[in-house]
């Protein structure tokens, strides 16, 4: 079963205009061709199809790095054929990963003694990192419950409803109940008080988010830690905290060094961070570090020797490329603390330019906070005539990819547009985006509202039938518009290839 959708379900042929210089036969779409074709033709066919992809630099939906220095690109290409798991064959690559783990652990204030090495691993992203951290929490909790002679078959984890989907995957794949703290209008992150109220003896950990996907806001990890310390004292439990710092882990240490969210807090036992977000590496690298070796149960670590030497491993996959690990090490030594600080401050300044430009239009409410991930989340003050989904769709004509989405349960009537500010998003682009948004608003203002047009037709028909039309409330109209546009966007997505 193919989970992603394709443009056509029929096994029609693929043709390419310029590839006809090398080959005149068409290619089947879903079957391997019987014969070989020239390399020039294969390249041209694929290149022609990829032209219809969006421009990664203008993809403002993604947190993932889309630009690196040419020197780092060369290092990555030079190591693209190295399988990272062959540690005995590529010992220097393994050493570079270990250096990265230790640098990140020190960045997060891990309580390491002089000469002590950090406990952590490189992953293909924060999703795998969260799976590994969750498994460690689950196994530690199971061992504790078994030692106390208590049942250990109903673990749960407490999170906010704003968590990324990988937390839902962890809960479903590894049979852990997910207890979500609902959001509310104006408060789009987990409330520490409500989270601690949901903690019970079966809670393996509370997950705090440093940089919400929805609006970039940092959750109050220190407040959560303090409340949980008190609850643990009252109950005799030892419920720990995991910090999902996928987005904020490479931001907070450089811009908000006084903010306590990491291993300075005693209940924080593990932290994950995405190297391919604000770690400034192309997609495919994440990290998870533990407070100390006692927080990672030994029985989860495998030892293999069929690649030439005894190798401890704790991953969900086996083979993976070395390029991203090498690229992460390059960025850490190339930029250093000063360089990362400069990049993050520049991102924040560009986010401020965009925020101020949107505020000057007088048309938007800014949902994101100034302290947090450098992004701008905003919604229309008045969406009775046109909504955020229409703005998102129309902006694509200018090349911009700006997502529109609804908030999670209890705040799902709020629709938001979000622009992520990455290193390659300049002040000039921010100013240009504001101008293009103003053009879109002007264009939409000149068009009749779809809901009003439908209402006029309904009133006409009702008058002819001698009946009355029930006019919906503003909130009913808003919800109807959001639902319709959400369905429209989802249907469009089904018609194009999507990564699962």
Curated annotation (Swiss-Prot):
GO terms for molecular function: calmodulin binding; glutamate decarboxylase activity; pyridoxal phosphate binding. The keyword Lyase applies. It is an enzyme of class 4 (lyase). Keywords: Calmodulin-binding, Decarboxylase, Lyase, Pyridoxal phosphate. Its cofactor is pyridoxal 5'-phosphate. GO terms for cellular component: cytosol. It holds the Pfam family Pyridoxal_deC. Residues 469-500 are annotated as: Calmodulin-binding. The modification N6-(pyridoxal phosphate)lysine is found at residue 277. Signal peptide: none annotated. It comes from the Eukaryota. Its EC number is 4.1.1.15. GO terms for biological process: glutamate catabolic process. The keyword Signal does not apply. It catalyses: L-glutamate + H(+) = 4-aminobutanoate + CO2. Catalyzes the production of GABA. The calmodulin-binding is calcium-dependent and it is proposed that this may, directly or indirectly, form a calcium regulated control of GABA biosynthesis. PANTHER family: GLUTAMATE DECARBOXYLASE (PTHR43321:SF36). Belongs to the group II decarboxylase family. Homodimer. This is Glutamate decarboxylase. It comes from Petunia hybrida. The lineage of its organism: Eukaryota, Viridiplantae, Streptophyta, Embryophyta, Tracheophyta.
């Amino acid at each position: 079963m193919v989970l992603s959708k394709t443009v056509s379900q029929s096994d029609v042929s693929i043709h390419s205009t310029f590839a006809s210089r090398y080959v005149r036969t068409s290619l089947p779409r879903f079957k391997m061709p019987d014969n070989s074709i020239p390399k020039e033709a294969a390249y041209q066919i694929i290149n022609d199809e990829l032209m219809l992809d969006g421009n990664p630099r203008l993809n403002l939906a993604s947190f993932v790095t889309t630009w690196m220095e040419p020197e780092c690109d060369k290092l990555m290409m030079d190591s693209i054929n190295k399988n990272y798991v062959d540690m005995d064959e590529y010992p220097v690559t393994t050493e570079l990963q270990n250096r990265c783990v230790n640098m990140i652990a020190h960045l997060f204030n891990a309580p390491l003694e002089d000469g002590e090495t950090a406990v952590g691993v490189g992953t293909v992203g924060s999703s795998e990192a969260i799976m590994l951290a969750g498994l460690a929490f689950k196994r530690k909790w199971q061992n504790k419950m078994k030692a106390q002679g208590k049942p250990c078959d109903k673990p749960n984890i407490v999170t906010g409803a704003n968590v990324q989907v990988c937390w839902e995957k962890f809960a479903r794949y590894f049979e852990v109940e997910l207890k979500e703290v609902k959001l509310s209008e104006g408060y789009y992150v987990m409330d520490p008080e409500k989270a601690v109220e949901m903690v019970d003896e079966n809670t393996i950990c509370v997950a705090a988010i440093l940089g919400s996907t929805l609006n970039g806001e940092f959750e109050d990890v220190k407040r959560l830690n303090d409340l949980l310390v008190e609850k643990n004292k009252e109950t005799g439990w030892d419920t720990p905290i995991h910090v999902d710092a996928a987005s904020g882990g490479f931001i907070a240490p450089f811009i908000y060094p006084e903010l306590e969210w990491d291993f300075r807090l005693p209940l924080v036992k593990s932290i994950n961070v995405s190297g391919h977000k604000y770690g400034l590496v192309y997609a495919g690298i994440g990290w998870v570090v533990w407070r100390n070796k006692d927080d990672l149960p030994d029985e989860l670590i495998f030892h293999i020797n069929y690649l030439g030497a005894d190798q401890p491993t704790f991953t969900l996959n086996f083979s993976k490329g070395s390029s991203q690990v090498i690229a992460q090490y390059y960025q850490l030594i190339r930029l250093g603390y000063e360089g990362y600080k400069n990049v993050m401050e520049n991102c924040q300044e560009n986010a401020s330019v965009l925020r101020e430009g949107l505020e000057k239009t007088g048309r938007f409410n800014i949902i994101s906070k100034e302290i947090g991930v450098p992004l701008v989340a905003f919604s229309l003050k008045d969406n009775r005539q046109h909504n955020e989904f229409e703005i998102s769709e129309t902006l694509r004509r200018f090349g911009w990819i700006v997502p529109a989405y609804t908030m999670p349960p209890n705040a799902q009537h709020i629709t938001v547009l979000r622009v992520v500010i990455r290193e390659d998003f300049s002040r000039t682009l921010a100013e240009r985006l504001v101008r293009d948004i103003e053009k879109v608003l002007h264009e939409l203002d000149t068009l009749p509202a779809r809901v009003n047009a439908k209402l006029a037709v309904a009133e006409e028909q009702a008058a002819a039938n001698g009946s009355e039309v029930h006019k919906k409330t503003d909130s009913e109209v808003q919800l109807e518009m959001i639902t319709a546009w959400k369905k429209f966007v989802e249907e469009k997505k089904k018609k194009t290839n999507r990564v699962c």
